[in-house]
């Protein structure tokens, strides 16, 4: 440690402060406010004294011909005067941007599809008009096929907007939810003032089956019968059982 100089044995703060004080910053000159743009022309000494010969004269003349220098000078003068000189010979022309090209004629299949589509639209519109006209009235109907051609179903479909809607009667007939039997004709089919009697509804149940009747028990044997129905009939010879008498002994 004795061999080291005092500069390295001091405190690091003192050493850093000494380094900062020892440095001298470079004083750069401030740039001029009016900085001139340097072009490629300024890199070559084009204008020389006639007495001195320039070895690069031919190369410079080949790189910058006289016509290029004259155009550059005219552009600089035009920009300085405020007239660029561009667009002086332009004339206002009205352009028609409409396309007059005709497309290919439609094929036969496309024409048929267009006609079918138009017919479907017409039928849909007519159906909508018919539904709209009869939307204010609800008429009960009973078609052969439930849900098809029913005026009540059309009313519900037009009012709800659901094409699969059905009236309650067609729904019950289609699903067999209840036993259905027509009571009267559909509205509109029978004329007013007719004296014809309406048909009575068909019977909902078949003929009741014959049930056996209870018979009194007797000790006497019954005679032979030809069929089981004979057993269900009352035997006129049967007498009521007298409970006051003693039961006969069986041999």
From Swiss-Prot:
Location of the motif LXCXE motif, interaction with host RB1 and TMEM173/STING: 97-101
UniProt short sequence motif PXDLS motif, CTBP-binding, positions renumbered to this chain: 240-244
Region (Interaction with RB1 in competition with E2F1) location: 38-46
Any one Pfam family match given in the protein's UniProt record, by short name: Adeno_E1A
Record flagged with keyword Magnesium: no
InterPro entries cross-referenced by the UniProt entry: Aden_E1A (IPR014410)
Keywords in alphabetical order: Activator, Early protein, G1/S host cell cycle checkpoint dysregulation by virus, Host nucleus, Host-virus interaction, Inhibition of host innate immune response by virus, Inhibition of host interferon signaling pathway by virus, Inhibition of host STAT1 by virus, Interferon antiviral system evasion, Metal-binding, Modulation of host cell cycle by virus, Modulation of host E3 ubiquitin ligases by virus, Modulation of host ubiquitin pathway by virus, Oncogene, Transcription, Transcription regulation, Viral immunoevasion, Zinc, Zinc-finger
Region (Interaction with UBE2I): 74-136
Classification of source organism: Viruses, Varidnaviria, Bamfordvirae, Preplasmiviricota, Tectiliviricetes
Homology family: Belongs to the adenoviridae E1A protein family.
Gene Ontology process terms (BP): regulation of DNA-templated transcription; symbiont-mediated perturbation of host cell cycle G1/S transition checkpoint; symbiont-mediated perturbation of host ubiquitin-like protein modification; symbiont-mediated suppression of host innate immune response; symbiont-mediated suppression of host JAK-STAT cascade via inhibition of STAT1 activity; symbiont-mediated suppression of host type I interferon-mediated signaling pathway
Region (Disordered): 102-122
Subunit structure: Interacts with host UBE2I; this interaction interferes with polySUMOylation. Interacts with host RB1; this interaction induces the aberrant dissociation of RB1-E2F1 complex thereby disrupting the activity of RB1 and activating E2F1-regulated genes. Interacts with host ATF7; the interaction enhances ATF7-mediated viral transactivation activity which requires the zinc binding domains of both proteins.
Source organism superkingdom: Viruses
Zinc finger (unnamed): 150-170
Residue span of motif Nuclear localization signal: 246-250
Function: Plays a role in viral genome replication by driving entry of quiescent cells into the cell cycle. Stimulation of progression from G1 to S phase allows the virus to efficiently use the cellular DNA replicating machinery to achieve viral genome replication. E1A protein has both transforming and trans-activating activities. Induces the disassembly of the E2F1 transcription factor from RB1 by direct competition for the same binding site on RB1, with subsequent transcriptional activation of E2F1-regulated S-phase genes and of the E2 region of the adenoviral genome.
GO molecular function per UniProt: zinc ion binding
Acidic residues: compositionally biased ranges: 110-122
Compartments, record wording: Host nucleus
Any GO CC annotation of this UniProt entry: host cell nucleus
Name of the protein: Early E1A protein
